[in-house]
Amino acid sequence: MPVCHYPTPIMLRALLLSLTLITGLAQASTIRQLPLSLDTDQGTLYGSLLVPQSDTPVPVALLIAGSGPTDRDGNNPAGGHNDALKKLAQVLARNGIASLRYDKRGVAASSQATPDERNLSVERYVTDAEGWGQQLKRDPRFDRLILVGHSEGALIASLAAARSGADALVSIAGPAYPIGQVLDAQLAMRLPPAQLAQSRRILASLIRGQEQADVPEPLQVLFRPSVQPYLISLLRQNPAEAFAVLEIPALIVQGGHDAQVGVDNAEILKQANPDAELALIPGMNHVMRITPLPWQEQLASYNDPQLPLARALGEHIVRFIRSSAEQNGR
């Protein structure tokens, strides 16, 4: 009986599995993760640099985390462990784009830089992003700097773009409304009338730049005296205005199922800066995963690092970074 030399389905599956494993190992061996630090006036910040192997300079993305004590990987004690920024860095590296993600001052490895939240401010976060960006711009391994901000990090990216020397910017789930307006709208949906009136009194005072010592216990988590200096600095900001003055290529990425930053924010950013590209990703939520629309059905994704990022997210960002190189003539 002649021997059949045609591969059987089982053989094909085994071959494909082997090729997948070999390809994965090859990719892993050509991507290096290196520690990087930035000295500031209040201590040292620490981050992770992910660099794909290349004989020529590559683009580098500075990943800027969102609000609260969010670490370099996108994890937050209150907001879940989902590795969103770590996974985004890996996607970029597989596509030949380096990235730096870092622990914000007062967080994780950077905890000794401004350990007291009374000394935090938007301006300090912006200065940090500028410092990281300038450090990356001086590195001969990289030819372009792209700021990639998530949520509040998108505002920081817009404010830091000019002095960091950024060549392009990506806003993921970036807010557009003045922060005081956003806070008031969120509280109006959650607080009973008496507490809402108290919160509006405190908010109005903070908007005027005046701290409030008298904060009722139910509102301490948001308006505790130690966080008020930071809130005052945040309430000064108008994200749409900051985005409007960008003079570099910009991409707005927004998920259709984002329960924290609605699609209307992306539309306002686009109106503020008509030259920016807009990518709406159906089904993507605030932590960059594809989920159902109801909030209760999204909660698990905030604490699931195994859940993959929305595929379209990486595709849009990689395509933009490559096309912005052509706009910059590089």
What role is predicted for each listed range?
Residues A84-S111:
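Conserved alpha/beta-hydrolase
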Residues V287, L293-R330:
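Catalytic active-site module of serine/aspartate enzymes centered on a nucleophile-bearing elbow/loop
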Residues L246, I252-Q254:
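Short beta-strand/loop motif that positions the catalytic acidic residue
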Residues V170-E241:
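Accessory cap/linker subdomain of secreted extracellular hydrolases
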Residues Q134-M189:
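Primarily recognizes the serine-hydrolase "nucleophile elbow" in alpha/beta-hydrolase
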Residues S29-T56:
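N-terminal cap/lid segment of alpha/beta-hydrolase-fold proteins
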Residues A84, E117-R138:
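Alpha/beta-hydrolase active-site loop
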Residues D55-P57, A61-L92:
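Short, surface-exposed "cap/lid" segments of acyl-processing enzymes
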